[in-house]
Regions:
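Histidine- and/or cysteine-centered catalytic micro-motif in compact active-site loops
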Residues: 37-39, 169-174, 182-184
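A generic fold-level signal
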Residues: 134, 161-163, 183
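A short, N-terminal "cap"/entry segment at the start of jelly-roll beta-barrel domains
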Residues: 141-178
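Short loop/turn microsegments at loop-to-beta-strand junctions
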Residues: 9, 165-166, 186
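Acidic-residue sensor for enzyme active/binding pockets
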Residues: 112, 168, 187-188
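Nucleotidyltransferase catalytic core that binds NTPs
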Residues: 1-147
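Glycine- and acidic-residue-biased ligand/ion/polar-headgroup-sensing regions
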Residues: 184-192
Length: 192
C-alpha cells in the first residue's frame, strides 16, 4: 500500500523541530504533503505574519523531503479542508492516508481528530520526537527584542535610545563575562 502523510502549519519561520518532523515523515511514508496555513490564520493565531505565504512556500518547497506544498482554506482554524481534498484524490484501495502532528502535539485533542476518525484517516502523533525543539513564536520574539546568545548566557536590549541602550544580561551559573574595553561608550552596571 502507498502511504501518504499530510502535515500542516504556519512554518513562520521554519525551525529545526519542523525539519525533524519532515525528515521523520519522509522516512516513514511514501509521500509527504505539507499544507501551508494562510496569512490570515497567522494573524488570527499570532497577531501578524513574519514571512509572506509565498516566501514560506518557497522555503518549504526547497526542503528535499517534502513532495508537495499546498495552500488551503483554513478559515475554521483547521486543515480539515486540506484533508478532505487529499482524501478525495486518492484511491482508497491502494493508498493509506495519514495526518501527522509534530512531537510537541503528540496525543492531544485537535480539530482534525474527529474528521480523521470518521474518514478512516490514520493519525501519526509525535513526528520528529516528543519534545518541542523550538518555537517559531520564540524565534520571532527573541529576534524582535534583540536577544543575543553568548557562551556565558544571553543579553536582551530592554530599551534603546539614540545615545543609550539598556540591556538585561543573564549569566549562566559557573560562567563569567569576558573583559572588554570600549573607546566610544561607557557602561554602568546594576547587579541584582
Amino acid at each position: 500500500m502507498h502511504k501518504i502523510i499530510v502535515l500542516s502549519g504556519g512554518f513562520d519561520p521554519v525551525h529545526e523541530g519542523h525539519i525533524s518532523m519532515f525528515h521523520d515523515a519522509a522516512d516513514k511514508y511514501d509521500e509527504v504533503i505539507v499544507g501551508l496555513n494562510s496569512q490570515e490564520w497567522l494573524e488570527r493565531k499570532k497577531g501578524r505574519a513574519f514571512m509572506s505565504d509565498q516566501t514560506r512556500a518557497c522555503v518549504l518547497t526547497a526542503i528535499g523531503c517534502i513532495d508537495s506544498v499546498r495552500f488551503f482554506d483554513d478559515s475554521d482554524n483547521s486543515c480539515i479542508e486540506l484533508l478532505r481534498e487529499v482524501h478525495s484524490e486518492i484511491d482508497l484501495d491502494t493508498t493509506i492516508l495519514y495526518f501527522g502532528n509534530g512531537g510537541d502535539r503528540a496525543h492531544g485533542n485537535f480539530a482534525e481528530k474527529e474528521f480523521c476518525e470518521a474518514q478512516g484517516i490514520r493519525i501519526d502523533d509525535g513526528l520528529g520526537g516528543t519534545s518541542k525543539q523550538n518555537s517559531s513564536s520564540d524565534i520571532i520574539q527573541n529576534w524582535s527584542i534583540g536577544k543575543a546568545e553568548r557562551v556565558w548566557g544571553h543579553w536582551i536590549v530592554a530599551k534603546s535610545y539614540p545615545n543609550c541602550k539598556i540591556k538585561e544580561l543573564v549569566v549562566n551559573p559557573g560562567c563569567t563575562l569576558s573583559w572588554q574595553k570600549h573607546n566610544h561608550r561607557a557602561e554602568e552596571w546594576f547587579v541584582r
